[in-house]
Structures are given as structure tokens and as C-alpha cells.
Curated annotation (Swiss-Prot):
It is an enzyme of class 2 (transferase). Heterodimer of an alpha and a beta chain. It comes from Postia placenta (strain ATCC 44394 / Madison 698-R). It is found in: Mitochondrion matrix. The active site is at residue 236. The keyword Mitochondrion applies. Pathway: Amino-acid biosynthesis; L-arginine biosynthesis; L-ornithine and N-acetyl-L-glutamate from L-glutamate and N(2)-acetyl-L-ornithine (cyclic): step 1/1; Amino-acid biosynthesis; L-arginine biosynthesis; N(2)-acetyl-L-ornithine from L-glutamate: step 1/4. Its EC number is 2.3.1.35, 2.3.1.1. This is Arginine biosynthesis bifunctional protein ArgJ, mitochondrial. NCBIfam families: ArgJ, PRK05388.1.
Amino acid sequence: MSARLPALWKRLSSTISPRPAPPKAHHHAPIREAAFPNGYVLTGLHCGIKKTGALDLAVILSTTPKPASAAACFTRNAFKAAPVVVSEEVLQRSASTARALVVNSGCANAVTGKQGMEDAWAMVRATDALLGHSAKESETLVMSTGVIGQTLPICKVLAGIESQSSDSQTKSLGSDFTAWERAAKAFMTTDTFPKLRARTFSIDGREYKMAGMDKGAGMIHPDMGPPRMAGQLHATLLGCIMTDAAVSPRSLQSALTYAVDRSFNSISVDGDMSTNDTIVVLANGSAASDPAAEIDEERDPRTYQIFRDELTTFAADLAQLVVRDGEGATKFVTVSVNGAATYEDAHRIASRISTSALVKTALYGQDANWGRILAATGSVPLSVPIDPTRVSVSFIPTDGSPALPLLVNGEPETVDEARAKEIISVEDLEIEVQLGIGSENAKYWTCDFSYEYVRINGDYRS
């Protein structure tokens, strides 16, 4: 049977010429130093996990006198990696505060048993030591990404962390663009560019800053929730966002949970959930010395909602970078599902379309096969059943030209195939599904499946 596979592959691929992924480096550009939040120092370095010599360890410290409010959303995979379990424990012990984050790439430290847990705690303790004598135990969150089932070269990792101590000649912690960029690069595995963003926003005349980085290109279909939430099963998605706003821990977690559902939990590259998916937010309050300026959902819902919406927009920007860098991807696709009875219904349908291998391969082949979109839509159980006579499907061009209806109120349109191919041949496009049931909408961001995706993942460990 195996001898037939090359011939079968050749026959199946003969009708579509492999196309290289479009250039992606332009999604990363220098950021002015004034855009980064106050009160953070960070770096990225090579400690020896990656054989290539690439950066594989990031250290991020908050320098404010008091610990930063900390919030996180973690994978709901039953096989949670050691750093996920340890970070959940740190947040529980510290009443949702933290002073540091340490991240390694090249080894996931997942399904590594007792040794993996010991190694994750060792990374926490080593980073805690960088904070000085005033630091309490367990003020560091930890994240890892890479191959599952392999243990960390922990001596190399600890040496890398210790190289950032105050008396070390190799200390490289900083707050300029280079420091932020090196940290972002240390997150990377199969990523083709570092994913780093920063922005400034105002609430009631007070200026705040927010910066963040994430990584991910494969094994991307997150379903993350707050610490200790039980959930269902589904390369890793890791991300961190730092702000100099003062936000109460409870409100920060509430805002992050809302934001993640509309950003990182709304992307898919290949439909596979990682054991390590983690998003962390630190809010150190360095922009507001007045305790009354702390953002709190119960005390001032209006101010909280402004912050929550800023965080959601920023998180969506970071999440979309992951899809744009999807392994072998040639297209960035927005899936919009409108007119559902509930947001959850719209989100489930958008997720199903975004993970359909048939839809994703049709996108790569530039085939306007809307029947696959409709089949995916109809396969999802909803709180209010679909009425097929109300459903419409369209391609939305990204150049501002008119939409191309494919199905209108359950009736197929006579499609201009040349126009459809023109729309689907560009890098960015949107699929819109109108259910005609209610007023709730949801978006998902996905990419196509290419031959290159198969090659990357077939060779991942070699």
C-alpha cells in the first residue's frame, strides 16, 4: 500500500500547481519606543533548547513596586502541559497578581510527568530570584511551546534565566524596541515572523499604553478559559499583553475572558487544540499613581467597558497575525456569520466553516464551491434551528467592490465563475453567511490548507 502513495499523491496533485505562500515579513515592522507601556523590562536570548541557535527563552519583568494584576486564559485540553498547571497554581496562590513571565520555545514540556512539573517550578523560582529580595515566592508565570513529550534541558534554561540577574555581565533586559522584538522572537517555533504590536489609548483624558506579542502557526484552534475551568477536548498559541493601566485583578480576568472569546478563541489554522495554549495579561498600573484611577467593573462599569473593548480590539489584532502566519497558508479568510439567534450559535457555525478541510482546500484551489460552506453551516446543532429558506451565502471582496451572492434565501444564484475566482484568488477575502434568524453575529479568522502545510508537519520533528 505504501508503495502506491507517491503515485497517488502525484495523481491527486496534478490538477493544482503548488503555490508558495505570499511574503509575510511586512506584518512585522519597527515600533516607536514611546508606544510601549511603562514599567516593563524584557529580553529574548538563546539558552540552548533550539539546535539552530535561534532565540528560545524570553524573560519579562514588571518593575513597579507593587505586583501587577494578572489574568490568564488557558487551554481546556485534558492533557494540560506542566507550565499551564503551574501558572494556574501561581495565580491561585498570588490572588491573581504577578511580577514576571518566563517563556521557552522549542520544547512544550507537555506530557512529561513529574519531571516536567519540577522543571516548570524551577523556571518560576529562577525568575522569581531576578526580582530581588523583596519578591515573594511564586510571582512568575511560565509558558512553553514546542514538541510534546520531551523534557526540557533544564540546566540550560536555568542558566539562561540566571544570566539576567542584576550582577550578570550578560544581562540584556531592556525596554526599547529591540528588547521587545527579541522577546517576541524567542516565542517563535514554526512562525515566519515575530508577532509584536503596541498601541496607545485614552480613557477620560488619561493616556494608557498596551503592548503584546504572540506566537503560533500550526496546531491552532484554541479553546481557552479562565484558570481551573473544566472543558472539552479539542504549534501552540502563546501570547502575552502588558499594559500600564491600573485594573483590579477580577476585572482584568473578566475583560480578558471576554476578549479571548472574540479573538484567540475565534481563530483556526488546522482545527487542532494544543496542550499549552495560554494568554496572559499583566496590568502594572504605572500610568496611574492615584488608587482611585484603578479600573474596576463594579465601581465604574463604563470605564471598564472602554478598557475591555480596547483589550478586545488589541487581542483580535494579535490573533489575526497567527492566522496570517498559518503554516503554508496562502490566504487569510474572515468568516462572518450574521443573523443568528445567539452569539454562541453564530460562533459555532463560524468555527465549523473555518475548520472544514473541504472548505479550506477549496480556498487553496481557488474553487468557489459554496456547497461546502453550506454543508458545514448545516452540520451545527443550534439553539434555534436553521430555516434553509432564509440562508444566504456571499463572497465579500476586500477591495471594496460589491459582494458576490452565491445563495440567496436558500436559492442558488447564477454565479459568475470568473468573478468568483477573481475574488478568491487574492490573499484576503471574506465569507459571509446570513442565517435570517435573529440579530447576533460572530466572526472567525482562518486560512487555507496547502501542500506546504503537509510538508511542514510531516517534517516537524526531523
